[in-house]
């Protein structure tokens, strides 16, 4: 059999808990001033089948990116109405249809840019509101399964450089369990900082399942530590390279049918 693990690298996210659905959102930048402009990316968005859209049947409902403020919820008015980052979703019965509609309208990955009401923003994610977004009416709700990515410190920008896949190649059943393969990556930040680096499946689970059963999976590791628990790293500034290792560790119980298997993992920076 042949096994390939695909990797997505993200920065500035809160680590998520296990979920059947998850939207990964990455803050890119935020300017200073009373009315900051933020940039963010929606990197991936998956939904479990059959989950009801929480605002299905409402007279009007919108979804899009916005920030959570220290004082509470956002309004979505700037992001939706002024900058066109949102779609109307009250007509879709399921969350899976909502994700598909957003992907069709905007594309994923999707980069959004918009001005917010205050510099006191804590994180950025996907939000919805079951009426037309209105300036000053801050009652938008975080979309179930959306990561709220922690906004980095002022003037701090970090990036991850990492191969997009780990190729285990052809492996026999007798040598499968415990087999590892690693790739090297680098993190660069404008300022010195301390981070935790996490790895997990793109659906938010601890392991990357490689077939339809839980008996065949990859356990992602960072610097030979559990990707789920995270590895702490001190990062130098001035955009210097700080190396790390990503490892895919295979596990199987029983015989795996020969074939070609792939899975999707995500590597996440969380600022401390």
Language-model features, listed with the residues they occupy:
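N-terminal hydrophobic targeting signals that begin at the initiator methionine
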Residues: 1-2, 23
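N-terminal signal peptide c-region/cleavage motif recognized by signal peptidases
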Residues: 13-18
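Mature extracellular/passenger domains of Gram-negative fimbrial/pilin and adhesin proteins
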Residues: 20-272
């Amino acid at each position: 059999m042949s096994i390939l693990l695909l990797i997505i690298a993200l920065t500035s996210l809160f680590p998520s808990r296990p979920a059947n659905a998850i939207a990964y959102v990455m803050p890119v930048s935020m300017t200073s001033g009373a009315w900051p402009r933020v940039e963010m990316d929606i990197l991936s968005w998956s939904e479990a089948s059959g989950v009801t859209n929480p605002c299905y049947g409402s007279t009007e409902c919108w979804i899009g990116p916005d920030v959570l403020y220290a004082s509470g919820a956002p309004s979505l008015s700037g992001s939706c109405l002024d900058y066109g980052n949102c779609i109307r979703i009250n007509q879709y019965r399921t969350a899976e249809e909502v994700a598909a509609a957003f992907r069709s309208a905007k594309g994923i990955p999707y980069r959004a840019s918009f001005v917010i009401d205050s510099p006191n923003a804590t994180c950025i994610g996907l939000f919805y509101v079951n009426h037309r977004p209105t300036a000053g009416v801050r009652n938008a709700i975080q979309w179930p399964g959306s990561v709220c990515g922690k906004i980095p410190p002022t003037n701090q920008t970090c990036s991850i450089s990492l191969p997009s896949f780990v190729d285990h190649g052809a492996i026999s059943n007798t040598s499968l369990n415990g087999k590892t393969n690693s790739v090297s990556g680098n993190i660069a930040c404008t300022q010195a900082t301390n981070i935790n680096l996490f790895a997990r499946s793109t659906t938010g689970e601890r392991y990357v399942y490689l077939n339809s059963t839980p008996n065949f999976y990859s356990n992602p590791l960072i610097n030979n530590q559990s990707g789920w628990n995270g590895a702490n790293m001190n990062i130098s500034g001035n955009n210097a390279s700080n190396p790390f290792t990503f490892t895919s560790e295979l596990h199987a119980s029983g015989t795996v049918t020969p074939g070609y298997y792939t899975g999707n993992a995500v590597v996440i920076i969380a600022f401390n």
